[in-house]
């Protein structure tokens, strides 16, 4: 691997990516661009080695499956500054660089007496990645607290500021996911309240708070409850390669939900994102099809959580992708429900 160092950025050739994805699969970037100062981005992208080539942005690689070597150039942001840029009577605006660790931002916000992000504690990844997927967990999603996304628009070759409406947030969706080749996120501003109605009615949070003895819970208590639950249910990607939940929970029309419940009375159903819609548990569907805890070679499904695809050691991205496809096909055959992956698949088609 050869390196070229410039002011604000560094370009490396034939860079290994195993340490840059949480599945820990082997892959190689023809070019790896590390940007330390976002203002240097236009100059870096104009470098003759990578000008006009496809770009893959990797934060911590916690929401990708590298099923092959990515084409073109892999881009990583190393800007890791966090600060409060505005105080108001009942909220504050927090700005974080794209390279900031997501969980570190959650802890920072709590230390500043701010709430809103507590249910999103311990999600792996970086701040720059969080708007793309509109990350969500335990009844909360980050789009509800994003004030502005700062990005470089590759179409106009200008830095732009997109407010929440411009971001077109949906369930695990955004304009950044819909137009992955257009925007390069360099920082995010969050609108975080001083006081916030806590979300406690999801996935055992109240029970965990009771175990903690936190009867009068605050935001920090909720964050700790979420951390405890996640550590019990989800494998640490530093120990066992994974990307968290691999499949989205399917959103279906109410009529289809009713037909499924007529055949499968014990099927859990949750409110959808809009009227006339319901949400199924992908984990339940997968477990009912017998995949929870199954292992083939070094590819498998976690025995603790049916949504988590794991690499026990030397599974390739292609092997993990094949395993995931067969899971989805078995669910389709049994329930006529289509599962979609949460991670972005690189080097192959789903």
From Swiss-Prot:
Enzymatic class: oxidoreductase
Instruction: Quote the Pfam families the UniProt record gives.
Output: FAD_binding_4, MurB_C
Q: Catalytic residues per the record? A: 172, 245, 342
Which HAMAP family does the entry link to?
MurB
Domain of life according to the entry = Bacteria
The compartments listed are: Cytoplasm
UniProt protein name: UDP-N-acetylenolpyruvoylglucosamine reductase
What NCBIfam families does the record tag this protein with?
A: murB, PRK00046.1, PRK13903.1
Record organism: Xanthomonas euvesicatoria pv. vesicatoria (strain 85-10) (Xanthomonas campestris pv. vesicatoria)
Q: Which reaction does it catalyse?
A: UDP-N-acetyl-alpha-D-muramate + NADP(+) = UDP-N-acetyl-3-O-(1-carboxyvinyl)-alpha-D-glucosamine + NADPH + H(+)
